[in-house]
């Protein structure tokens, strides 16, 4: 077995700048396959990873998030804004539209599991990634969407201005695509980013409601639940924005 020695260490704390820098590095990595580098064709590569992951999550969805009585519980009302139930149902009805639209995007080679434990940025603006077990082909922007969604879920849930970070990451990712030589439409990459990140709300919201329903009645909800709910609503915002784009010409 051949293994690469990773010289850089694991940095326990990342400034927002580092998250943004990595977004650009991922753009350079993906963009190379839009600028002439041949896509790999090995039969074992993951194809349709997001669709497969979404349908796998469905197996563990009890349907609790599609029941109005769930949303009428006092603890749920205190954590999620009015109207979120109707918005979530609309998302569920349009999810397949998003998945179909993602399939139409220009394809790139992707790591498919880019998040902090698998990323080792170097001081020379290089990036080493480990755990390539899910690598494969996906639409431009999907890599960034998964990176962003996983980052919110693991490290940045308490970030006050998530929209600003999403916008900056999208800009930096597109800059990386340009530096790699791609001259295509940035809107395609931004759609891929928003849609793939937003689809995570379809897993996160049912999971949140399932766990909240098991919590004992307490006077104050722990801060971590409030943070996770703000993340879920933000991802729903991204999903809705991408659904609007998918309804027209993506």
Model-derived segments and their meaning:
Residues 7-12, 130, 150-159:
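Glycine- and acidic
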Residues 5-111, 217-224, 239-242, 248-249:
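ATP-dependent phospho-/nucleotidyl transfer catalytic cores
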Residues 182-199:
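All-alpha amphipathic helical-bundle segments outside canonical DNA-binding/catalytic cores
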Residues 92-142:
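Active-site acidic catalytic loop and adjacent metal/ATP-binding pocket
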Residues 141-180, 198-217:
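Active-site activation/catalytic loop segments of kinase-like enzymes and analogous catalytic loops
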Residues 33-42, 177-187:
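Surface-exposed helix-capping loop/turn segments at secondary-structure junctions
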Residues 195-250:
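ATP/Mg2+ or Mg2+-diphosphate-binding catalytic cores
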